[in-house]
Amino acid sequence: MKQFMDENFLLSTDTAKILYHDYAKNKPIFDYHCHLNPREVAENRQFNDLAEIWLEGDHYKWRALRTAGVPEELITGKATNYQKYLAWAKTVPLCIGNPIYHWTHLELRRPFGITNMLFNPQNAEKIWHQCNEMLQQPEFSARGIMQKMNVKLVGTTDDPIDSLQYHQAIKNDESFDIDVVPSWRPDKVFKIELPQFNDYLVQLSEIADVDIYTFADLKKALLKRLEYFDAQGCKSADHGMEIVRFSAIPDESVLNSILQKRLQNQPLLEEEVAQFSTAILVWLASEYCKRHWVMQMHIGAIRNNNSRMFALLGADSGFDSIGDRTYAYPLSRLLDAMDKENQLPKTILYCLNPRDNEMIASMIGNFQGDGIAGKIQFGSGWWFNDQKDGMERQLQQLSQLGLLSQFVGMLTDSRSFLSYTRHEYFRRILCEMIGGWVEKGEAPNDISLLGKMIEDICFNNAKNYFK
């Protein structure tokens, strides 16, 4: 019987162990998509206690707590941090079989070095005091943890109207050598159907100093913000797409009419929503190309399912799930519309429903080219798929329908400074899979060849892709 989470956790073959320990383990982290608050990095936040750094804003843990019957008061309510922490300690033993059980223990091991005890009610008080003592030390500040985890770059997620003042402050601080770059997230622009669209355009108009009455005005305002983001080191644009829409792009006069209808709070037809969305996204893609940005699309979530809890807690509180809309055809047409004018940027496609894995893995092959290795990527297992089975499925289907060797690898997609252990989790799973191929005679026993492939997937490919 293997010991729980020893140094060879998830590694069952000699080849897998060599690949992980000699090639994957010590590669830096290039975390090209996350939801960290840049203010916490700029101000080098020192966390008061383990609950603050561990449970604050972590909707994965919140969902588990609710499922275990923990009252909301002990999750997002006014209970003390220690009370919330004890509720988590009681819940974790119930999570065996869920990736949260693995993540929780990995997060205690790195960066805290707790390897000799399980997280449960019996050990909770000891772990609380031990970790809290460390959290008061400079090396366990927000920046200290990033350095301890060997992070080289993080890409945050930022609205076009964000000031990016904290990114600028980090950039100007020569004492900190980790790149923290903004990523453009224009969801509130291309989703004209959102109730807050008109209010958002007022904000965009103010920050860009452009009156927005026409489609040309909107592009002018966005162009000023694109240039500002680019000057702040932006490398990527991300798009949350619950629905993938496509329609032939009409004349600009039609787009002006659609925009005017929306500004006057008149209802739009679905076709008009699709025309507007397609026009904005195709135009944005051309602007990304000019700036050599990567375009990311996160496809297929159903958000804010629980309207009662949404009214109480707002978005990103643990009430989202996997959607089942089909979108192969509109996605194909959208990418093709971008590509027709040779204006399709480097692109990463993520699907939330694993049913769509093969579709996405085959779709990316349609638009490769321009002498760019892995120009179009099938993104790592996302959200409900960033667990062992989900990662394995994504890796296997990418390897079978694309080139795994060109994959840009893992990202945290997280709000937590403790989530860098997800890169370790991914690397162990990757090495186990490739090591298994060798042991079964399905790949050559060429450690030098495979080791380079591992290093590329873990770090080098992403570094080169997001230049």
UniProtKB/Swiss-Prot annotation:
Q: Which reaction does it catalyse?
A: D-glucuronate = D-fructuronate; aldehydo-D-galacturonate = keto-D-tagaturonate
Q: Could you confirm whether the keyword Isomerase appears in this record?
A: yes
Ordered alphabetically, the record's keywords are: Isomerase
Which class of enzymes does this protein belong to? isomerase
Membrane spanning stretches? none
EC number, as in UniProt: 5.3.1.12
Q: Name one GO biological process term.
A: D-galacturonate catabolic process
Its pathway is: Carbohydrate metabolism; pentose and glucuronate interconversion
**What Gene Ontology molecular function terms does this protein carry?**
glucuronate isomerase activity
List S-S links within the chain: none
Q: Which SUPFAM superfamilies match?
A: Metallo-dependent hydrolases
Highest taxon of source: Bacteria
HAMAP family xrefs: UxaC
The family database entries (NCBIfam families) matched by this protein are listed as:
PRK02925.1
Q: Which family would the database say this protein is a member of?
A: Belongs to the metallo-dependent hydrolases superfamily. Uronate isomerase family.
Query: Which named protein is this?
Result: Uronate isomerase
Q: Which organism is it from?
A: Haemophilus influenzae (strain 86-028NP)
Name of the coding gene: uxaC
